[in-house]
Curated annotation (Swiss-Prot):
InterPro entries: ARM-type_fold (IPR016024), INTS7 (IPR033060), INTS7_C (IPR054519), INTS7_HB (IPR056517), INTS7_N (IPR056516). It comes from Homo sapiens. The modification Phosphoserine is found at residues 338, 809. This is Integrator complex subunit 7. It comes from the Eukaryota. Belongs to the Integrator subunit 7 family. Keywords: Chromosome, Cytoplasm, DNA damage, Nucleus, Phosphoprotein. GO terms for cellular component: chromosome; cytoplasm; INTAC complex; integrator complex; nuclear body; nucleoplasm; nucleus. Component of the integrator complex, a multiprotein complex that terminates RNA polymerase II (Pol II) transcription in the promoter-proximal region of genes. It is found in: Nucleus; Chromosome; Cytoplasm.
Amino acid sequence: MASNSTKSFLADAGYGEQELDANSALMELDKGLRSGKLGEQCEAVVRFPRLFQKYPFPILINSAFLKLADVFRVGNNFLRLCVLKVTQQSEKHLEKILNVDEFVKRIFSVIHSNDPVARAITLRMLGSLASIIPERKNAHHSIRQSLDSHDNVEVEAAVFAAANFSAQSKDFAVGICNKISEMIQGLATPVDLKLKLIPILQHMHHDAILASSARQLLQQLVTSYPSTKMVIVSLHTFTLLAASSLVDTPKQIQLLLQYLKNDPRKAVKRLAIQDLKLLANKTPHTWSRENIQALCECALQTPYDSLKLGMLSVLSTLSGTIAIKHYFSIVPGNVSSSPRSSDLVKLAQECCYHNNRGIAAHGVRVLTNITVSCQEKDLLALEQDAVFGLESLLVLCSQDDSPGAQATLKIALNCMVKLAKGRPHLSQSVVETLLTQLHSAQDAARILMCHCLAAIAMQLPVLGDGMLGDLMELYKVIGRSATDKQQELLVSLATVIFVASQKALSVESKAVIKQQLESVSNGWTVYRIARQASRMGNHDMAKELYQSLLTQVASEHFYFWLNSLKEFSHAEQCLTGLQEENYSSALSCIAESLKFYHKGIASLTAASTPLNPLSFQCEFVKLRIDLLQAFSQLICTCNSLKTSPPPAIATTIAMTLGNDLQRCGRISNQMKQSMEEFRSLASRYGDLYQASFDADSATLRNVELQQQSCLLISHAIEALILDPESASFQEYGSTGTAHADSEYERRMMSVYNHVLEEVESLNRKYTPVSYMHTACLCNAIIALLKVPLSFQRYFFQKLQSTSIKLALSPSPRNPAEPIAVQNNQQLALKVEGVVQHGSKPGLFRKIQSVCLNVSSTLQSKSGQDYKIPIDNMTNEMEQRVEPHNDYFSTQFLLNFAILGTHNITVESSVKDANGIVWKTGPRTTIFVKSLEDPYSQQIRLQQQQAQQPLQQQQQRNAYTRF
């Protein structure tokens, strides 16, 4: 089973070297383990993690770990150390060990060795296995015993194991807490050992009583042992315990603030700041106004920049959370807590122009967050302070190429975007500052500033036109060197120009960009700019850039990919000539566009490979082609009202048949077909959306907009022609209320609202079908097509990669060979799966659970046709399982009462953290042959044999009568 399932996984993985199946790979490593040379044994051991990565199913992992346990049992300490490292690296695979008892038994045998180093390695090994053996009493006993050892190495290993078991087992934590307390407080325990024992207390959070006793002990330690190291370790453990147990977080914040204020030691203050930052990130809602005020006072009083920087970083974290609302809320006893007069604002204003960049950045961030979150009208002075602070920081950091300056600049630019979004009336001055500084800044800073300008222009398109002049001037004078920064700057500037040019690029802008790109030998830069042009709907520019790249690629797959992009851009460019009320021209434009789309889809199919099938791209383009054809067909149908109007007796026919639509003539049937076609397209767009689990939100929104376009037209057909009386506009009326994140979405929303208004107006005024109704439909199509299609990121680039590999057992040796099952028994089908990720797992969404659907269908019958209940003829089951460490397994009991060959299909889909179901696949099929059980077969044969003499006797009697 494992070898079959993992072979397909390797075929998909695309490794360059020659691959073996799971059993062969394990046998190769087993040879190394049995070698007499220590070097070969070690090499075999350290290659196991890669084996687990390639074949992540339990049957192989179980065998491999048992072999490693044998090596651990009989090998020397160096081999044991190698096995320990492999176990720690393969932590996520430990729960796939099936024979845990046997595995632990082989490991545990070494604990009785006379060698303290061997015992120490065994203890560390047991600690690494704590997640799968949390309640093993013999392991608990060995750890307690080893804590009393006279060998330092063994004691340190016991401390490591105790920490791991305390995190996993409540019983162990309760039992070890008193012993650790005695050891820490004992005079005979060395100080360095006490420092290693104290962090174990952070895991004593399994219940309130245990957490309380651990807190009391830590409180005693902080008071009784005032040395710097002890205070630092105790306070940090205190913080981690509070963060885990949650109930004592406010007390811990007060304690840390007390040490920050009163303890003169810098190291303790730094630790307090670090822990306050941790609590600010994890539990900002537990911070009271008094806590923030105390931190502000400390920051105002401290003369040390390093400490002030730390405190401001805590405050800047809090200023972006609910804590800032608490701070400025109306307090009993005060009329109001004005932002302008608070210590927090004074501190931020004081730090905005500090000579330390980090302090200035955090000061500006605090001011920005206060300005955006406090929706009061009299904040003009605060807004000006925030803007001036950002401007000074921008000037300071844009002239410096150092990594620190770039990190500070990112903070400032993020604040600018936030300020422009939260306070739109400040956006103009922010943009002017950026454009002014863009000319004199370093290239690295220019790139970041371009990203900032693009983000602001996406949010506030009205500012785009004002940017273009400065941007084009800069593009003309930009350097032409082939350095990475210059290439990146060309792409960033071009992106801002595309965003700022809301509808179409001017001829001058195109000429400037092309002129600069001609001198750039880097084809990758040209491709990236073309990609951005496709994303922003500048298809004429994109077509020319793709055309220029066709001769610069070596691979035929890349050639076909670029050629397909060129054809798609050309196809979309054909639609820019559409004009309202000119329907014959619209038909010719759509026909021309379809011609190039068909060429493009042929190239795109040629560009796909087994490792990169381009499934999303192909489906997206096929849907676009079908949508254009549906639009064309609908325009022809509307035109047919002129060429083939309803006959004079149409009204009489309609009254006779009782179908009011018949008075419209044959156009009614054609419209009904069109409506069904658009609904079918909307359903297919929905399927594409559900299959795109790894797509970014902008791409998904784009697919959603295409789906809404189909639904809009189908609704318009129904409301205008097919069923005007029952048409409802309420469910469609809210489309414009959602916030649009891109110019494409904004324009599409505008078209939707306009079309809905027109349809509703006609629906109320006129009865169908008139030329005004068909003209409204045609104008709606033209309005939708006049918005240039946006090819979003996922069409070009896959930032997140998630796939599921399934293994079924039992499974046949040959995939085409069926599994034999008796018809009076049930088949226990075990389904195992592994979730595989790319380099950025969970970037856009994470898998919460996997939904497994198992169904069976009868392929061919054999034997007699018995009357069997319908319930026994098919199997249809579904289960949801939550992956743990990217692994899941479950079982299904299937019934095959009908003799014959059955086809079992297992299909997986996933559910993300928001509860949305995604049809990711895969779909796996096996065959089962249902055979008659021997006992039933024997009885049937006996009955047949008993019937044969009776039949012969009847036959003889018949002959006698004759």
